[in-house]
């Protein structure tokens, strides 16, 4: 059985958020999911800090609010909490791996 990729989660969840997947910015970077209100970065739980930085950049570039979706195992609860402490203005969502 093949392990799901990050893009599989984006494809499964972004449409339910009312978003467009892989939205390309002028500098050719890609927002994982651009909704009418948020620039959403999906990433693996342990990469929470990178997700925070990308969400902030994409939000600034699009005029949307920043959000991250962390793909986590049950025992990785410390990572979403770190993201919330480090960046309290970013919406942090968690989905199971």
Residue spans of the language-model regions?
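Short, hydrophobic/amphipathic alpha-helical patches that form generic packing surfaces
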Residues: 11-14, 56-60
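Active-site regions of enzymes building and remodeling cell-envelope glycoconjugates
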Residues: 19-21, 39, 89-92
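Short connector loops at helix/strand junctions that flank enzyme active sites
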Residues: 28, 35-37, 53, 63-65
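Conserved catalytic cores of phosphodiester-cleaving nucleases, focusing on short active-site segments
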Residues: 33-44, 58
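Nucleic-acid nuclease catalytic cores
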Residues: 44-52, 59-97
């Amino acid at each position: 059985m093949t392990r799901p990729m990050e893009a599989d989660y984006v494809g499964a969840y972004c449409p339910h958020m009312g978003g467009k997947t892989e939205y390309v910015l002028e500098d050719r970077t890609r927002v994982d999911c651009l909704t009418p209100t948020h620039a959403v970065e999906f990433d693996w739980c342990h990469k929470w800090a990178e997700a925070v930085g990308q969400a902030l950049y994409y939000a600034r570039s699009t005029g949307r609010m920043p959000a991250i979706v962390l793909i986590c195992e049950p025992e990785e609860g410390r990572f979403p909490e770190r993201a919330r402490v480090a960046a309290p203005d970013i919406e942090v969502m968690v989905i199971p791996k």
